[in-house]
A protein has these predicted regions:
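Bacterial N-terminal signal peptides
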Residues: 11-19
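Sec-dependent signal peptide cleavage junction
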Residues: 18-32
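Short N-terminal segments immediately surrounding and downstream of signal-peptide cleavage
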Residues: 31-40
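Structural signature of tandem-repeat unit edges
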Residues: 40-51, 62-75, 85-98, 107-120, ...
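Beta-solenoid repeat scaffold
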Residues: 59-60, 200-203
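Consensus positions within tandem repeat domains that build extended binding/scaffold surfaces
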Residues: 78-80, 100-103, 122-127, 154, ...
Length: 409
């Protein structure tokens, strides 16, 4: 009887050691139905079945140099290895489904493979890893943020990650999380393909995603469509609707580009991206008025006159209005308070009078198409609409606080 009690006591003690003992003290493997940890000669081995307990954290442990998580473990908790400053190597099995927030924050890992089984990745999980250069990870995942008031970055734009290599199909909205110089698409992805670390459609005809750390985007010759989402991203914080690639300073658009699109309406957001691009080189001579208007909105920090000179063969200026060869009013940048649009204009592009200092605008009957947010944030007071206009376009008078008179024939 005494012998049985002794065995039971030892078993219970081992189980308690396995689940809660810090790695700095656990120097022997202990069998247990849950998840166990063993630290020996700088190698931390985590084994068992199920989730790592929330209290199984090794934060700040400087004895850990390598982490091996065995098959059967299904999750890594928040802050699990945070500030283990000597941790250089991590092995994660394909049974793991979630990686907690700040789990590898401020470690010395140089590369990491997050298996394709992972569906949730915590905010800050790979931030402040100054030696990290290569990340292999899924392209489709959700981000878990323990504090929704803070941003959801999983990598830091201030670190040195050179390449993100995807091991599953890409969810294009996740491009906002890849703070790297290059993103390489999984070779079995049927929708996307990488060229020189930039994401394009599978056929290479549309540029769709630029890695966040690049300072120059040279769109490949042969690409025919420039999608705004290549350089604008959904927000990862509560402070804005979209954000721009903060590193981007130069954009080169080749001769092959025929149109510019905003497939996800990123430029229609209330708090839109603000770019710091210093130079845009446009070699294409095929762009229509709407394409030029989208580029103008996308890079609206560039002085309008300076920007429009890049399209000297495709646009003319008349009374402060930039009008394309296909008769689209692209932008107004004049000083006149009262504007009369010429009778040959057929369309007014998105954001044409955005923030314009105008009081009245006469729109002729020749105009049959109206873009989004035409007068947004302008000082417009009075507008005369054309006879054939049956509906007000989306956001046409958005945030026009001075508007008092809209004449509808």
């Amino acid at each position: 009887m005494r012998k049985s009690k002794k065995i039971l006591a030892v078993t219970l003690a081992a189980a308690m050691l396995c689940s809660v003992l810090p790695a700095s003290q656990a120097n022997a493997a202990v069998k247990h139905k849950g998840v166990c940890s063993t630290l020996k000669n700088g190698v931390l081995t985590i084994s068992g079945k199920g989730k790592m307990p929330k209290n199984m954290k090794f934060r700040g442990n400087t004895k850990i140099k390598k982490v091996i998580i065995k098959k059967g473990v299904t999750s890594i908790p928040d802050n699990a290895f945070k500030s283990c400053k000597k941790l250089q190597s991590v092995s994660i099995p394909n049974t793991v489904k979630s990686v907690g927030s700040y789990s590898f924050y401020n470690t010395a890992i140089e590369n990491i493979t997050i298996p394709k089984s992972v569906k949730t990745i915590g905010a800050g999980s790979l931030c402040n890893c100054k030696l990290l250069t290569t990340v292999t990870m899924p392209g489709k995942f959700k981000v878990y943020a323990p504090n929704p008031e803070k941003n959801e970055d999983i990598m830091s734009r201030y670190d040195n990650i050179k390449s993100v290599k995807l091991n599953t199909i890409l969810d294009i909205s996740n491009m906002k999380y890849f703070s790297a110089m290059n993103v390489y698409i999984w070779n079995k992805d049927t929708k996307y393909k990488s060229y020189d670390g930039v994401v394009y459609s599978k056929d290479g005809k549309t540029v769709l995603g630029m890695p966040l750390k690049r300072d120059e985007l040279a769109v490949r010759e042969g690409c025919t469509t420039f999608d705004v989402q290549a350089v604008a991203y959904d927000s990862v914080s509560k402070d804005s609707d979209t954000f721009a690639c903060g590193s981007l300073r130069k954009v080169i658009i080749p001769e092959s580009i025929e149109k510019v699109v905003d497939s996800r309406n990123l430029l229609s957001k209330t708090k839109r991206a603000e770019f710091k691009v210093e130079d845009i080189i446009v070699k294409s001579k095929k762009l229509d008025g709407n394409s030029i208007a989208l580029l103008s909105t996308c890079f609206n920090h560039i002085e309008t006159e300076k920007f429009m000179k890049k399209f000297s063969n495709q646009i003319k200026k008349e009374d402060g209005m930039y009008i394309s060869n296909d008769n689209v009013l692209v932008k107004y940048d004049g000083k006149a308070k009262n504007v009369v649009i010429p009778s040959y204009v057929k369309e007014i592009a998105d954001n044409a009078f955005y923030t314009a200092n105008v009081e009245s605008v006469d729109i002729p009957d020749s105009v049959t198409k109206f873009g989004k947010n035409i007068f947004e944030l302008s000082s417009i007071v009075k507008v005369n609409l054309p006879k054939n206009m049956k509906t007000i376009s989306e956001g046409m008078f958005k945030n026009c606080s001075n508007l008092v008179d809209v004449k509808i024939p």
